[in-house]
C-alpha cells in the first residue's frame, strides 16, 4: 500500500510539534516564524498565513509576536495548543 504525503496543514502541525516547549518563552527559534515554517514544509512564505488560518480558527494553533533568534525585530510565531498537539500526535502515529 502506497503512503500519501501529508497535506500542508498536516506538515505544519508535525513541524510545530517539535517546538511545543517554546510556547511560554520570550525568545523563540526561527523555525516557528512564518519563514521558518515555510522552509520546513516547502511552501512560499506568503502562503503560510493562508495555510494556518483554518488551524487558528479550529483552535489547534495560536499566533503571537515574539523575539525570534537571529532577527532584530519581533515576528509572528506560531504554537500548537493542547488540541493541536493531540492532532499532531495522531497524524504522527499514522
Across the structure, where does each feature detected by a protein language model lie?
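Amphipathic alpha-helical dimerization/coiled-coil segments
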Residues: 1-4, 86-94
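Short alpha-helical segments that sit at the start of domains
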Residues: 1-19
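Short helix-capping/hinge SLiMs at alpha-helix to coil transitions
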Residues: 18-29
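Short, solvent-exposed coil/turn segments
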Residues: 27-30, 71-73
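A short alpha-helical element within helix-turn-helix/winged-helix DNA-binding domains
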Residues: 29-40
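Short amphipathic alpha-helical interaction segments
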Residues: 42-57
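A short, conserved structural fragment
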Residues: 56-67
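Short, cationic-aromatic polyanion-contact patches
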Residues: 66-90
